[in-house]
Amino acid sequence: MLKQLLSKCAEGKALTEDEAYAAMNIIMSGEATDSQIASLLSMLRLRGETVDELVGFVRAMRDRMTAIEASDDVIDTCGTGGDGAATFNVSTAAAIVISSLGVKVAKHGNRAVSSKSGSADVLERLGIDIHTSPSAAKQALETKGLAFLFAPLYHAAMKHAAGPRKEIGFRTVFNLIGPLANPARCKRQVVGVYSTCYAEKLAEAMRRLGSEHVLFVTGRDGLDECSIAAETDVVELKDGAI
């Protein structure tokens, strides 16, 4: 089936939500070759991912992830990365600061793939154990107000795409859908996005996926952050309206 979906993409056609769901399931089950995964990621990047594709991919990720129970007031600060600016990991610093103010943060993150520093890289350099179990993460969230959810532990099936992602090096759809698949199922987030166009797509995708209040920020200088060197565009999803 994946060959048929690849052929459809090669013709410049977009996948339906169900087709995207099926493609991601094939990847996560280990049935896709590295070449097939790299081909799909490259074609999607060149054409531009649609909202239907994003929703289908995220649904598949959520269905296979190891989730943790969390209260409705938990938030996440996460970015797409891949802006090429080599800035420090702002979302991790922001998570630490706001948790000290009493906000519960389930910080979802990974090591760097298409950027210089991921949140896991930062925390490891600080001497923090990132390989915490779901039960330990849940307890930390309840007692300390901050937990780090290391993506490979909660999205174990994504290991099949790790090699192709690293080899091709550029940002892919995984940069976009990672922030949408928090294991704590956060419905409130601040998401840094490297493109306002994609911020709007992600807002619509998260609306369809049930998020309640999400801010998507994009610096006009290309940062997936609130920029201090240029104006910042903000796309807000709140109570079903964008």
Swiss-Prot record:
Residues binding anthranilate 1: G79, N110
Catalytic EC class: transferase
Keyword Magnesium: yes
Record text on cofactor binding: Binds 2 magnesium ions per monomer.
Pathway(s) this gene product operates in, as recorded in its UniProt entry: Amino-acid biosynthesis; L-tryptophan biosynthesis; L-tryptophan from chorismate: step 2/5
Source taxon at top rank: Bacteria
Single GO term (MF): metal ion binding
Signal peptide coordinates: none
Known EC number: 2.4.2.18
The protein's required cofactors: Mg(2+)
Positions annotated to bind Mg(2+) 1: S91, E225
Residues that bind anthranilate 2: R165
Keyword entries, A-Z: Amino-acid biosynthesis, Aromatic amino acid biosynthesis, Glycosyltransferase, Magnesium, Metal-binding, Transferase, Tryptophan biosynthesis
Pfam families referenced in this protein's UniProt entry, alphabetically: Glycos_trans_3N (PF02885), Glycos_transf_3 (PF00591)
Annotated InterPro entries: Anthranilate_Pribosyl_Tfrase, Glycosyl_Trfase_fam3, Glycosyl_Trfase_fam3_N_dom, Glycosyl_Trfase_fam3_N_dom_sf, Nuc_phospho_transferase
GO terms for cellular component: cytosol
Residues that hold 5-phospho-alpha-D-ribose 1-diphosphate according to the record: 79, 82-83, 87, 89-92, 107-115, 119
Family named by the database record: Belongs to the anthranilate phosphoribosyltransferase family.
Quaternary structure and partners: Homodimer.
Function summary: Catalyzes the transfer of the phosphoribosyl group of 5-phosphorylribose-1-pyrophosphate (PRPP) to anthranilate to yield N-(5'-phosphoribosyl)-anthranilate (PRA).
Protein name stated in the entry: Anthranilate phosphoribosyltransferase
Organismal lineage: Bacteria, Bacillati, Bacillota, Bacilli, Bacillales
Chain's gene name: trpD
